[in-house]
Design a protein with these regions (language model features):
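Extended hydrophobic-aromatic, low-complexity segments
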Residues: 99-101, 108-109, 161-164, 186-187, ...
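Short, intrinsically disordered, charge-balanced linker/junction segments flanking boundaries
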Residues: 1-3, 174, 204-207
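Edge beta-strands of extracellular beta-sandwich domains
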Residues: 158-170
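Short, solvent-exposed loop/linker segments at the N-terminal edge
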Residues: 78-83, 183-192
Length: 207
């Protein structure tokens, strides 16, 4: 995906790119040999329910320049992983960002736009995830501790322009229903999609 995005940025004649697949789909179950009875693929950047996966935000940060993208992954609820290395990735349309765990800076990362398909194909570059550093901001040595992960994004002038937080979830407390619209037509055809979320007492999503 990184090199496809790079080519689109580099060559003005390219007007877009094709992603296999946009959505998960029924049939071609994967992995068919372990998780029986699988009935769906897992290749999409959006799942069967229409919910974006993490990788969706990598594409969104380049396809949608009119809106801010600032996405942290993974979630931060890992009971039993205390003290273990748990990498953090950030997908954003800004060039750099800084991550904080419970208020302590984990350092600032900047996209490396010098990375090309040619200079990132050797075994050392692959082992170092060099190709991914062109469009992803990665903190590979962060250690898990329950609490808050905060990301602060910076523009090309070094100014802090956006921030986002995710929190360790407690025990499931209640179910939250979120509709995608406030009104529907009473014509027997209109509809609304309702997202169901299991959250803790503070409203944090329970993974």
């Amino acid at each position: 995906s990184e090199m496809c995005i790079r080519d689109r940025d580099k060559y003005p004649a390219i007007c877009g790119e094709f992603v296999w697949t946009g959505f998960d789909y029924l049939g071609e179950p994967t992995p068919y040999y372990t998780d029986w009875p699988s009935h769906s693929s897992l290749f999409g950047i959006i799942d069967l329910a229409g919910l974006p996966k993490d990788r969706y935000y990598l594409y969104r940060s380049h396809w949608n320049k009119d809106e801010e993208t600032l996405h942290i992954l993974p979630h931060w609820t890992w009971p039993g992983r205390e003290g273990e290395v748990t990498p953090i990735f950030v997908y954003t349309n800004y060039p750099s960002a800084e991550v904080f765990i419970n208020g302590k800076s984990q350092g600032k990362r900047t996209k490396d736009l010098t990375v090309t398909a040619e200079n990132s194909a050797d075994s050392a570059s692959i082992a170092d995830f060099k190709r991914q550093k062109r469009y992803r901001l990665m903190w590979m040595d962060t250690k898990y501790e329950p609490g808050t992960v905060k990301v602060v994004a910076y523009n090309d002038k070094g100014e802090a322009v956006a921030e986002k937080e995710i929190h360790t979830a407690g025990k499931p407390d209640h179910i939250e229903l979120v509709a995608d619209r406030n009104e529907i037509k009473a014509d027997g055809k209109d509809l609304s999609f309702v997202t169901v979320r299991v959250v803790d007492k503070e409203g944090n999503l329970c993974p």
